[in-house]
């Protein structure tokens, strides 16, 4: 075999030659390599892994001994970029056409809120509210409670939505407190005519409306009589007491006096001025332009 290697010409060991003898090249220790500085792999699996991983496989093989510290742990270093792989990726990229029109950026949507949706209600009852907002027309809003009418708010509207929720400024409110207790079943239901008729009756002695006090005179109910102001005529008004039997004192038994409770006027009307107010749509009963 050694004699054949000595007699074999150099073309039999040349990989690029047509007369290359692979069996002779495997057993020959002097087989010339086309690239003398080529990297050697241990087996084909390592070579295939290098082809699939590119720079990663090369970096793993080159830095296998350097990637571990003295404690045996791997260091989280990124591998160096492979220029050959970068060139291959650049060749796969499609060329950019010079005369191509650039893509326009997406337009930002206009904000949608209560103020932008108010003009969209033109031609409807809500469109009239928008006209009152633009022309600053004073309106009146009738507000209800769980039983019926509560009061009237007169002012300028600044915002509203499709549910009839509205914000108003410079508001003058005329209202009556809700009826509670047994009076709920006995008092007549409040109407707009009764509300303003009651207000006219209370006008002569009006109080400060800003504090929510009643617009009419104070109640003319008398205060409950005190112990010191009790007259002897009131004491004698009770039923006659028979004299007690012998052996008992003849003093009369004390009578219990009941304090009279102040009568609450549920028909009392109040007025107040508000700088701004928010009215929920479920409480709106009627809206009309103030004359």
Curated annotation (Swiss-Prot):
Compositional bias of type Basic residues: which residue ranges? 251-261
Question: Which InterPro entries does its entry note?
Answer: Lsm11 (IPR039267), Lsm11_M (IPR034109), LSM_dom_sf (IPR010920), Sm (IPR047575), Sm_dom_euk/arc (IPR001163)
This protein's GO CC annotations: U7 snRNP
Where does it reside? Nucleus
Q: Which GO terms describe its molecular function?
A: U7 snRNA binding
Q: Where is the Sm domain?
A: 124-199
Q: Where is this region: SM?
A: 155-289
In the record, biological process GO terms are:
mRNA 3'-end processing by stem-loop binding and cleavage; regulation of chromatin organization
Q: What does this protein do?
A: Component of the U7 snRNP complex that is involved in the histone 3'-end pre-mRNA processing. Increases U7 snRNA levels but not histone 3'-end pre-mRNA processing activity, when overexpressed. Binds specifically to the Sm-binding site of U7 snRNA.
Spell out the protein name for this chain: U7 snRNA-associated Sm-like protein LSm11
């Amino acid at each position: 075999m050694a004699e054949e290697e000595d007699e074999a010409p150099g073309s039999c060991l040349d990989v690029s030659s047509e007369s290359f003898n692979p069996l002779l090249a495997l057993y020959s220790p002097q087989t010339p390599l086309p690239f003398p500085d080529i990297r050697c792999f241990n087996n084909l699996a390592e070579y295939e892994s290098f082809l699939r991983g590119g720079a990663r496989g090369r970096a793993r093989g080159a830095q296998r001994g350097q990637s571990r510290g003295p404690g045996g742990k791997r260091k989280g270093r990124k591998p160096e970029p492979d220029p050959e792989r970068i060139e291959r990726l650049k060749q796969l990229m499609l060329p950019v056409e010079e005369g191509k029109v650039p893509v326009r950026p997406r337009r930002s949507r206009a904000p949608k809120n209560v103020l932008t949706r108010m003009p969209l209600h033109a031609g409807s009852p809500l469109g009239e509210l928008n006209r009152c907002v633009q022309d600053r027309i004073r309106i009146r809003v009738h507000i209800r409670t769980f039983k019926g009418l509560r009061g009237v708010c007169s002012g300028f509207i600044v915002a509203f939505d499709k549910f009839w929720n509205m914000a108003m400024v410079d508001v003058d409110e005329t209202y009556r407190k809700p009826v509670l207790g047994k009076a709920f079943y006995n008092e007549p239901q409040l109407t707009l005519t009764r509300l303003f008729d009651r207000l006219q009756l209370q006008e002569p002695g009006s109080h400060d409306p800003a504090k929510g006090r009643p617009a009419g005179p104070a109640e003319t109910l008398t205060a409950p009589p005190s112990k010191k102001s009790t007259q002897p005529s009131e004491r004698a008004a009770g039923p006659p007491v028979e004299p007690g039997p012998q052996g008992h004192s003849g003093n009369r038994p004390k009578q219990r006096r009941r304090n009279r409770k102040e009568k609450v006027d549920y028909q009392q009307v109040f007025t107040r001025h508000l700088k701004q107010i928010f009215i929920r749509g479920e409480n709106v009963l009627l809206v009309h332009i103030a004359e």
